[in-house]
């Protein structure tokens, strides 16, 4: 059985994601497609607009065979750890033949060359990186500038690196490749050229509109029919059903009062979070005293060194309670389990193959004794239940994977 994998967030699923699924199947000629997906919180530091079980069901209805949850520790981490968490889980299954991700450049060799350089970190690169960081430049930008200067004698290469590293999906793709190299994985990487609007584009203006534009529309409008052209049919019908039921779409602003209340209640332990350094905690505390929306709060805190998404992740981690965990130790380890959120009949065959070839623990229901990584997922869902009244406290203990039969793809 030829099994391919994709790493996704689906916040929410749109036509660009359906394109990714179809192109992956065509490019890899796979018999089955496994998806590892962020749960109730996503990498930019937002609560997911839909709960993880609803997202997983949509994925199965649109061509994925098996959906595995990416632990919250990784889904709310930098691109480096986000990628490593996903790839390490996939590699541990011992049955994944390939992984396919979208990128702006669509050239696997160019991305592979940069990934190799970043992983090996030659001395000159380290010195250049430190010099830029010392100037107060964000890590992502400093890395970009260091690589450009490292290749200053090769004008074409230098210009290409600058272009590649200025685009988010290229950066994430490089991190997937670094993780594969680090793990000495046999999984073969593929990339497809990303289609449609940039993820920051908040306008609905083409077939492949961004997830940001869809979230913005849902936040401001009630006429779901406008989104019919931008969502897969099954996803559009599910959204209509959810709206009819009075489903509560979770938006980032819904976290703010909980975060502010936590701060004024005396929980001033942001310094325990990995991404918080150099007095950033005090900067955040001061901003919490006078900002009442997510955008205004993050907008006041962010700087050249601290990017918008990094601040968003810090706020999300604080909301959930990451500061009470030994994050350094957790991030240095690799997950020893996979949690199934949804499957179809082909996905069940994939699960049988995993059981035969891998020693990783497969969870369809939560075990009596949960490890630290899994307990953090449970805590995240409980925090999410404050934002989404369709999700109960301890929902993780009540839910089993959905098995969907006779999908059309």
Curated annotation (Swiss-Prot):
GO terms for molecular function: ATP binding; ligase activity, forming carbon-nitrogen bonds; tRNA binding. Pfam families: HIGH_NTase1. ATP binds at residues 7-20, 102, 169, 194. Keywords: ATP-binding, Cytoplasm, Ligase, Nucleotide-binding, RNA-binding, tRNA processing, tRNA-binding. InterPro entries: Rossmann-like_a/b/a_fold, tRNA(Met)_cyd_acetate_ligase. One of its GO terms (biological process) is tRNA modification. Its EC number is 6.3.4.-. It catalyses: cytidine(34) in elongator tRNA(Met) + acetate + ATP = N(4)-acetylcytidine(34) in elongator tRNA(Met) + AMP + diphosphate. It comes from the Bacteria. It is an enzyme of class 6 (ligase). Belongs to the TmcAL family. NCBIfam families: PRK13670.1. PANTHER family: TRNA(MET) CYTIDINE ACETATE LIGASE (PTHR37825:SF1). Catalyzes the formation of N(4)-acetylcytidine (ac(4)C) at the wobble position of elongator tRNA(Met), using acetate and ATP as substrates. First activates an acetate ion to form acetyladenylate (Ac-AMP) and then transfers the acetyl group to tRNA to form ac(4)C34. This is tRNA(Met) cytidine acetate ligase. It comes from Clostridium botulinum (strain Hall / ATCC 3502 / NCTC 13319 / Type A).
